[in-house]
UniProtKB/Swiss-Prot annotation:
A Gene Ontology biological process term: regulation of cell shape
InterPro entries: Fyn/Yrk_SH2, Fyn/Yrk_SH3, Kinase-like_dom_sf, Non-receptor_tyrosine_kinases, Prot_kinase_dom, Protein_kinase_ATP_BS, Ser-Thr/Tyr_kinase_cat_dom, SH2
PTM remark: Autophosphorylated at Tyr-420. Phosphorylation on the C-terminal tail at Tyr-531 by CSK maintains the enzyme in an inactive state. PTPRC/CD45 dephosphorylates Tyr-531 leading to activation. Ultraviolet B (UVB) strongly increase phosphorylation at Thr-12 and kinase activity, and promotes translocation from the cytoplasm to the nucleus. Dephosphorylation at Tyr-420 by PTPN2 negatively regulates T-cell receptor signaling. Phosphorylated at tyrosine residues, which can be enhanced by NTN1. Palmitoylated. Palmitoylation at Cys-3 and Cys-6, probably by ZDHHC21, regulates subcellular location.
Transmembrane segments: none
Pfam families the UniProt entry points to: PK_Tyr_Ser-Thr, SH2, SH3_1
Source species: Sus scrofa
Function comment: Non-receptor tyrosine-protein kinase that plays a role in many biological processes including regulation of cell growth and survival, cell adhesion, integrin-mediated signaling, cytoskeletal remodeling, cell motility, immune response and axon guidance. Inactive FYN is phosphorylated on its C-terminal tail within the catalytic domain. Following activation by PKA, the protein subsequently associates with PTK2/FAK1, allowing PTK2/FAK1 phosphorylation, activation and targeting to focal adhesions.
Domain SH3: 82-143
Designated name of the protein: Tyrosine-protein kinase Fyn
Listed cofactors: Mn(2+)
Subunit structure: Interacts (via its SH3 domain) with PIK3R1 and PRMT8. Interacts with FYB1, PAG1, and SH2D1A. Interacts with CD79A (tyrosine-phosphorylated form); the interaction increases FYN activity. Interacts (via SH2 domain) with CSF1R (tyrosine phosphorylated). Interacts with TOM1L1 (phosphorylated form). Interacts with KDR (tyrosine phosphorylated). Interacts (via SH3 domain) with KLHL2 (via N-terminus). Interacts with SH2D1A and SLAMF1. Interacts with ITCH; the interaction phosphorylates ITCH and negatively regulates its activity. Interacts with FASLG. Interacts with RUNX3. Interacts with KIT.
Length: 537
């Protein structure tokens, strides 16, 4: 079905590709490869680039009067005959404020203004109501972005994480943008065999000069939808036929609402503390709600922990850091007691998860994957020229599907408690801190790398305190003399060697987080081709 060209002669196997394979000598890790496409003008001030519509914004949409709609074509026709693309809801959404629109999956919208970035002003063609909608909940009607199986800019490793989630059968699949080839896509399929058990195979989808698509030149298609239909009916050389699109899960919002996008100092009265999750040296962490309808995590700081003015200044920077491996800062209450409002992670801290939760039963592949996620978040912090200063398992939060996110980045610099600022006081995390930072206050991204090496020991020992049997003073003295923790029980030598690399005395000899991410993501697959040639393709 939809096959434009089928050659009778037996097809040759697709060439193996080692896209993104580990290169330890250079620390290479493949990067994302955007796929710019050009769309016709629709006679409006601005329509987002459909291939990057989630990040669109900066210009307003001006829609002309006298509009009639066409559900079939996915456009609105103005009196002048120009078309305005309609958008369709990919998920249900419940309004959080009076400015938002509630809507259901499948509902169609006319976009009135996209100048608010992540929040677009829209009119529902179902209800006729106007309000703001989150832009990553919608896609242009009839576009590939509106397909259940299209995941856009999703990396190979994240594709594998999603496909290997519990409950997905063999043949679960998704299509994503190629990370290395402009205009191309990758098809990722969950497979199973006796040797490997559950695993994921990746196939390159290439683009023809005339706009078609193919995995093998013997079977070419006008659209990706036709390609998916073809391989849903037969394996035709793939590891198996395409059975069901991978479940996407709800997209993450980086703001509580359109109003808190820029004005994110919120009144204390808008927050409700519901369940205390933890109690630390400098405050408490609560599960709560904002506006009575949005679940959030709320960190409350003891008065005197840090200057409200300094905190607000740092929070301005923290709010701009947006990455799916960082806990998103939503809002703050900057008067003491300071409240920090972030996204809620339902499995709690990585430390508690490893010691007392589901993490106790995890095997090495899961633990290494969690380390890779932390490294990915830290690689972003590295690219942004930021420093965490307190990287350890207690400051990593865990969600469903073993998703890990980094919390409390940048806050350690602001703490004014004497027991902490002395750097060798009882409250200072000596065992995680690089010697140049503990002794001389030289905190850099390379001191974060040292801390990451300590975090690796926490992972493989399921939350054991580093340097067992040694107090803070002994640790500082011994590390200065060259002592490094030995290889933990059941830890592979290669992983311990990576820890030792993180603990080099000279900070500049320590690896980058980009290298650490690549090493850990490819830890179990570095010797295998990442893209499959297929059989009889």
């Amino acid at each position: 079905m939809g096959c434009v060209q089928c050659k009778d002669k037996e097809a040759t196997k697709l060439t193996e590709e080692r896209d993104g394979s580990l290169n330890q000598s250079s620390g290479f890790r493949y990067g994302t490869d955007p796929t710019p496409q050009h769309y016709p003008s629709f006679g409006v001030t601005s329509i987002p680039n459909y291939n990057n519509f989630h990040a669109a914004g900066g210009q307003g949409l001006t829609v002309f009067g006298g509009v009639s709609s066409s559900s079939h074509t996915g456009t609105l026709r103005t009196r002048g005959g120009t078309g305005v693309t309609l958008f369709v809801a990919l998920y249900d959404y419940e309004a959080r404020t009076e400015d938002d629109l509630s809507f259901h999956k499948g509902e169609k919208f006319q976009i009135l203004n996209s100048s608010e970035g992540d929040w677009w002003e829209a009119r529902s063609l179902t209800t006729g109501e106007t309000g703001y909608i989150p832009s990553n909940y919608v896609a242009p009607v009839d576009s590939i972005q509106a397909e259940e199986w299209y995941f856009g800019k999703l990396g190979r490793k994240d594709a594998e994480r999603q496909l290997l989630s519990f409950g997905n059968p063999r043949g679960t699949f998704l299509i994503r943008e190629s990370e290395t080839t402009k205009g191309a896509y990758s098809l990722s399929i969950r497979d199973w065999d006796d040797m490997k058990g559950d695993h994921v195979k990746h196939y390159k989808i290439r683009k023809l000069d005339n706009g078609g698509y193919y995995i093998t030149t013997r079977a070419q298609f006008e659209t990706l939808q036709q390609l998916v239909q073809h391989y849903s009916e037969r394996a035709a050389g793939l590891c198996c036929r395409l059975v069901v699109p991978c479940h996407k899960g709800m997209p993450r919002l980086t703001d509580l609402s359109v109003k808190t996008k820029d004005v994110w100092e919120i009144p204390r009265e808008s927050l409700q503390l519901i369940k205390r999750l933890g109690n630390g040296q400098f405050g408490e962490v609560w599960m709560g709600t904002w506006n009575g309808n949005t679940k959030v995590a709320i960190k409350t700081l003891k008065p005197g922990t840090m200057s409200p003015e300094s905190f607000l200044e740092e929070a301005q920077i923290m709010k701009k850091l947006k990455h799916d491996k960082l806990v998103q800062l939503y809002a703050v209450v900057s008067e003491e007691p300071i409240y920090i409002v972030t996204e809620y992670m339902n499995k709690g801290s990585l430390l508690d998860f490893l010691k007392d939760g589901e993490g106790r039963a995890l095997k090495l592949p899961n633990l290494v994957d969690m380390a890779a996620q932390v490294a990915a978040g830290m690689a972003y912090i590295e690219r942004m020229n930021y420093i965490h200063r307190d990287l350890r398992s207690a400051n990593i939060l865990v969600g469903n599907g073993l998703i890990c996110k980094i919390a409390d980045f940048g806050l350690a610099r602001l703490i004014e408690d004497n027991e902490y600022t002395a750097r060798q006081g009882a409250k200072f995390p000596i065992k995680w801190t690089a010697p140049e930072a503990a002794l001389y206050g030289r905190f850099t991204i390379k001191s974060d790398v040292w801390s990451f090496g300590i975090l690796l020991t926490e992972l493989v020992t399921k939350g054991r305190v580093p340097y067992p049997g040694m107090n803070n003073r002994e640790v500082l003295e011994q590390v200065e003399r060259g002592y490094r923790m030995p290889c933990p029980q059941d830890c592979p030598i290669s992983l311990h060697e990576l820890m030792i690399h993180c603990w080099k005395k000279d900070p500049e000899e320590r690896p980058t987080f980009e290298y650490l991410q690549g090493f850990l993501e490819d830890y179990f697959t570095a010797t295998e081709p990442q893209y499959q040639p297929g059989e009889n393709l």
